């Protein structure tokens, strides 16, 4: 049975990197789909772990793709991180900022004094990503934390998709500081709850909506985080997470929906339905034969085949390493 996903939801919360754009380029057909959602009256908000850029700059980039977006339609991990800071240290405190101009702006707007050195005796450190973050920046953060400063990280993404490939993300830099100080930060961004809760409260107040659907390309941040707060999630295979990764997920990382591209948000969704020995989704059927997961009909590279295979694996009650999955389903 196929029906539109939108029968159950009234607004979309979407990741940006790997979903709408990759670096400076849009991911087709995201701009067209976002325009169509707008014409249907479906509000769209953006939730990003990128803390280095100002919301206005992101909105301008989206406008360059033909996507209309107000700066306050973007909730970032920098904004959420500052909200966490306010729970940890008094207003007006000195905060050592590791990250870009966008994060520094949020810290200043939050009523804190921005400093760059541990010698300024900051009450807290907030660590976000920027391409020019250096060893010296990380060292100053480590010195301040060792002296007793509270530590907030905007996000823990290990990698950052770029046009030329995958680059180290903020989580990699946070790990470097962790190695030096022997403790872990509070994390504001996905997959932690604060950013989802802030986004939900903001957009429901702004648009009068109640039922969100979260769209993302990363299982470890987008899908896991949405699941953690009880938000329906859809994985789009245009970014980081792969077919193999989604097949092997435990309960906390399993998306409710899987799509190959954003265009499928506007198409009837082929929900997997049980067959005698497996599941069928659209034109594909996958069966469980003992410990073997095998395609019996359809194109193994299709999203239908992946949906059916995931249904077989997820309901088998057998860990993925105990199953022999046909390689064509995930390669």
Predicted regions and their residues:
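Asp-based, Mg2+/Mn2+-dependent phosphohydrolase catalytic module
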Residues: 2-14, 21-24, 28, 32, ...
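Conserved phosphate/oxyanion-binding catalytic-loop motifs
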Residues: 50
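Polytopic endomembrane small-metabolite transporters, centered on the Drug/Metabolite Transporter
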Residues: 77-79
């Amino acid at each position: 049975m196929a029906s539109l996903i939108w029968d159950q939801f009234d607004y979309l919360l979407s990741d940006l990197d790997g979903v709408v754009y990759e670096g400076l380029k849009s991911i087709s057909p995201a701009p067209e789909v976002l325009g169509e959602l707008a014409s249907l009256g479906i509000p769209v908000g953006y939730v990003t772990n990128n803390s280095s850029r100002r919301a206005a700059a992101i909105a301008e980039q989206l406008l360059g793709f033909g996507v209309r977006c107000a700066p306050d339609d973007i909730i970032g991990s920098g904004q959420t991180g500052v909200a966490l800071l306010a729970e940890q240290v008094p207003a007006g405190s000195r905060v050592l900022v590791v990250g870009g101009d966008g994060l520094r702006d949020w810290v200043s707007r939050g009523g804190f004094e921005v400093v760059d050195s541990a010698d300024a005796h900051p009450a807290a450190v907030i660590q976000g990503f920027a391409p020019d973050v250096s060893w010296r920046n990380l060292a100053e953060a480590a010195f301040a934390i060792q002296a007793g400063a509270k530590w907030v990280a905007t996000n823990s993404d290990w990698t950052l998709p770029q046009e030329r490939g995958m680059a180290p993300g903020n989580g990699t830099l946070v790990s470097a500081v962790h190695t030096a100080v022997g403790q872990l930060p509070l994390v504001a961004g996905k997959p932690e709850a604060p950013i989802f809760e802030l986004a939900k409260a903001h957009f429901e107040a702004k648009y009068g909506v109640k039922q969100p659907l979260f769209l993302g390309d990363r299982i470890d941040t987008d899908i896991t985080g949405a699941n953690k707060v009880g938000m329906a999630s859809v994985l789009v295979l245009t970014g980081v997470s792969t077919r193999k990764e989604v097949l092997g997920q435990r309960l906390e990382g399993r998306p409710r929906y899987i799509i190959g591209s954003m265009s499928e948000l506007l198409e009837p969704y082929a929900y997997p339905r049980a067959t005698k020995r497996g599941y069928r989704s659209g034109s594909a059927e996958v069966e469980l034969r003992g410990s073997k997961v095998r395609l019996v009909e359809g194109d193994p590279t299709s999203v239908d085949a992946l949906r059916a295979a995931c249904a077989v694996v997820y309901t088998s009650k057998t860990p993925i390493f105990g199953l022999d999955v046909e390689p064509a389903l995930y390669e």
